[in-house]
């Protein structure tokens, strides 16, 4: 990837994440992104053709608990500490459809 594409990708991800990044941060994340891709390339070079896949790494027995219904909090209790609420619902900033 070229440096320009990496910067554009970082800027796009920041916008989608609703983050405002400084130019130094974009450069830092771009370099980190480059390092991550380099590491992935190294992993792709590893010969694993004779290695069996791991399906489950946890060997110990799994214990399941009985599913017992319990009480829950009321709607009023749930929203009492919310920064904003309207009509019994949480009010949050819009994050979808802003492009």
UniProtKB/Swiss-Prot annotation:
InterPro entries xref list: Asp/Glu-ADT_sf_sub_c, GatC
**What is this enzyme's catalytic activity, as reactions?**
L-glutamyl-tRNA(Gln) + L-glutamine + ATP + H2O = L-glutaminyl-tRNA(Gln) + L-glutamate + ADP + phosphate + H(+); L-aspartyl-tRNA(Asn) + L-glutamine + ATP + H2O = L-asparaginyl-tRNA(Asn) + L-glutamate + ADP + phosphate + 2 H(+)
EC assignment: 6.3.5.-
Gene Ontology molecular function:
asparaginyl-tRNA synthase (glutamine-hydrolyzing) activity; ATP binding; glutaminyl-tRNA synthase (glutamine-hydrolyzing) activity
Q: Which GO terms describe its biological process?
A: glutaminyl-tRNAGln biosynthesis via transamidation; regulation of translational fidelity; translation
Subunit description: Heterotrimer of A, B and C subunits.
Provide the family line.
Answer: Belongs to the GatC family.
From the Swiss-Prot or TrEMBL record, give the protein name. Answer: Aspartyl/glutamyl-tRNA(Asn/Gln) amidotransferase subunit C
This protein's species is: Sulfurihydrogenibium sp. (strain YO3AOP1)
